Amino acid sequence: MKRNSINIHHVTSFSSSPFWCVFFLVLLCKTSTNALVKQPPNETTPAIIVFGDSIVDAGNNDDIMTTLARCNYPPYGIDFDGGIPTGRFCNGKVATDFIAGKFGIKPSIPAYRNPNLKPEDLLTGVTFASGGAGYVPFTTQLSTYLFIYKPLLFLKGGIALSQQLKLFEEYVEKMKKMVGEERTKLIIKNSLFMVICGSNDITNTYFGLPSVQQQYDVASFTTLMADNARSFAQKLHEYGARRIQVFGAPPVGCVPSQRTLAGGPTRNCVVRFNDATKLYNVKLAANLGSLSRTLGDKTIIYVDIYDSLLDIILDPRQYGFKVVDKGCCGTGLIEVALLCNNFAADVCPNRDEYVFWDSFHPTEKTYRIMATKYFERYV
């Protein structure tokens, strides 16, 4: 039986006291995050360590033949250094690459499972993120990109968040062998940990699988997501991380593929998808605030990317964009991962005019703008 059933079309207009309590917690988080993210005086950020899904995957899925959620082939990477497809779901760099550059750490963050990874890369940070991952375990076990009532194409997920933590444990042991236990602890303590996940849970698992909707309503499913995100952040804290940023989910109802599949004849942003995302983000921010207070550590924070991306989508010309409802690859309506390839899909020549690279992921230019917004707000 479904629990706590709600009308998701009107989630933003709730007037019940529990909702508003959570809402004000979000406001509190937003007004205090600037001070929370900064390092203590005279300390630098030695590394950025990333967990999550395809938004920040840099190639961890490249050699996993059981998943279609990989993109280590052209035209992916067409604007990356040397035009090489690295496994990033983008035409070039992703947001965490730009953030690493702005911190002066390195130009990009490599995938931990990259066979060409150099030992020195471990000292300055890697990404464990994997396309298809989610906070709900079965999101990774069976994630899908294409749905019209019934699944058209099943994409078995890559590396679950629990397994990403196992890889992190392996990473820590390698670090200890390189620089010793004490320096490893210091690097982990001062490094910036970023967790970016949740999009697949909402679009693919909840709204893509009728069986999940029979088991959960939006309220209970987003609570499950937010609780699992809190647990993940707490695990990182137990590993010694002291600068943890957990990013909210973006407005997934406005990505091209979801407009195509659920946006009606005019391909509008899907309101119920965005409402569910906003509800999840509110709960996530509240959970992280609660965790911070429980641990007595104010360096676990919520980072908003919903408004950052939505602002670009709603006012594209301000940022030099012309196309917001289609991706640059192929028709721009549905192509992502396997469907975006040199044999079946052409690529737009004017990529800087597109907000989205494929039907699910932003272009390098969009990521650059979002990284700038991040620095203006949180650093």
From Swiss-Prot:
> One biological-process term from Gene Ontology?
lipid catabolic process
Q: Which residues are glycosylated?
A: 42
> What subcellular compartments does it reside in?
Secreted
- Tell me which InterPro entries the record gives: GDSL, GDSL_lipolytic_enzyme, Lipase_GDSL_AS, SGNH_hydro_sf, SGNH_plant_lipase-like
Coarse class of the protein's main subcellular location: secreted
Question: Keywords for this entry?
Answer: Glycoprotein, Hydrolase, Lipid degradation, Lipid metabolism, Secreted, Signal
Is Secreted tagged as a keyword? yes
Active-site residue numbers:
54, 358, 361
Q: Which GO terms describe its molecular function?
A: lipase activity
Pfam families on file:
Lipase_GDSL
Q: Which CDD domains match?
A: SGNH_plant_lipase_like
Q: What is its EC number?
A: 3.1.1.-
Signal sequence coordinates: 1-35
The record ties this protein, via SUPFAM superfamilies, to: SGNH hydrolase (SSF52266)
Q: List GO terms (cellular component aspect).
A: extracellular region
Family classification: Belongs to the 'GDSL' lipolytic enzyme family.
Q: What is this protein called?
A: GDSL esterase/lipase EXL2
